[in-house]
Amino acid sequence: MSAWPDGRGGAAFPAGIKWQTVLDAVPQATRRHPAGEQKYIVCNADEGDSGTFADRLLMEADPYQLIEGMTIAGLAVGATQGYIYLRSEYPVAHRLLNIALQRAVEENFIGDNIQGSGRAFHLEVRLGAGAYICGEETSLLESLEGKRGMVRAKPPLPAIEGLFGQPTVVNNVLTLAAVSTVLESGAAAYESFGMGRSRGTLAIQLAGNIKRGGLIELAFGVTLREIVEDYGQGTHSGLPVRAIQVGGPLGAFLPESQWDTPLDYEAFAKIGAMIGHGGIVVFDSSADMAAQARFAMEFCVAESCGKCTPCRIGAVRGAETIDKIRAGRNVKANTELLRDLCDVMTQGSLCAMGGLTPNPVLSALNQFPEDFASPVIATG
């Protein structure tokens, strides 16, 4: 499993490490599983980042690719039950997945005795309830158990003690969908694409103020400038591109000086950015980046599970502080306070919700400071 690619979820955690950990883990006896025999495969299909739609398109176009990948994962790690945790706003994907699952059962590709092998794997779809925080794996597991979606403290990791207290693989749709391709072509063929530790291809989603939005699959190593100018053909408005946000609503705003950075996990980390799920949102020269920074704080206020104070309170105070800066009130002191708040959120939050919210805020503050001098207070 060492040749397995990095996951295609926001954290890009190596899928092979998760699988190996679950394979080696010993299930624990619980009230639900007194014999301690169960392991799980969970697909995170709660695609909630703004500007992302690759998961939805794949599930609607080829649900069997996801089913096959999850079945292989189950057989590989010794799991007999899988769940697809699907975003509730995807009714078409929900219908098509259930049709595909029924056909897979009828053809004996999943069930009690897969193709006469004596191996079992069962798979079901479960709908989320619309909470962005349930894209975080431990919140997802809480929701899947029928509880309020709230972040769990780690350790224990889900691979050791996940769904219903049992060893659980939690992978993204694109990660699991790539499994059959890797097995068919071989790890060497898959790793021939890309650069550094970023191997294979990435489903890049172009959105925002872009002339040609949509989904493109490219090998790692392509630059943002190539993606936006060559594939996206610039802005829809015709105005110059001012900023590019990569990695969803918690991604940094990148100015033109950083657009030649290759699409690579390590290269992005060096400039304080992240690739995330591959969503790219384009802003033209009319965009108010201070308003976008405030929106990031507002988004965190609305979507925080509320479990940890840095996220729950920090985002509220962050939005208030941005308003004060834009109103010209004690600008120097409030700017320092905003940076301190961001540092507390980054260092003290339990999960990426609060930990990454400072990314768009600080990048806007550092790269587009002139927008924070505006006397207009953004109201959201």
Regions found by a protein language model. Give the residues of each.
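Accessory "access/gating" subregions that flank catalytic or transport cores
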Residues: M1-Q28, R32, S192, R197, ...
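Conserved phosphate/anionic-ligand binding catalytic regions in large, soluble enzymes, centered on
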Residues: S2-V22, A73, G130-E142, G146-R148, ...
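Short acidic, glycine/serine/threonine-rich loops at helix termini
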Residues: A11-W19, T52-D55, H94-I99, C134-G146, ...
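Extended active-site and interfacial segments that coordinate phosphate-rich ligands
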Residues: Q20-G51, D55-G69, L141-T168
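Ferredoxin-type iron-sulfur electron-transfer modules in oxidoreductases and energy-metabolism complexes
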Residues: V26-A29, E37-K39, A45, A54-M59, ...
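Hydrophobic alpha-helical positions that pack around
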Residues: E37, H94-F220, G232
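Glycine-rich phosphate/pyrophosphate-binding loops
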Residues: Y64-I67, T71-S88, H236-R242, A315
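Short amphipathic, charge-patterned alpha-helical segments
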Residues: G69-A73, A219-S237
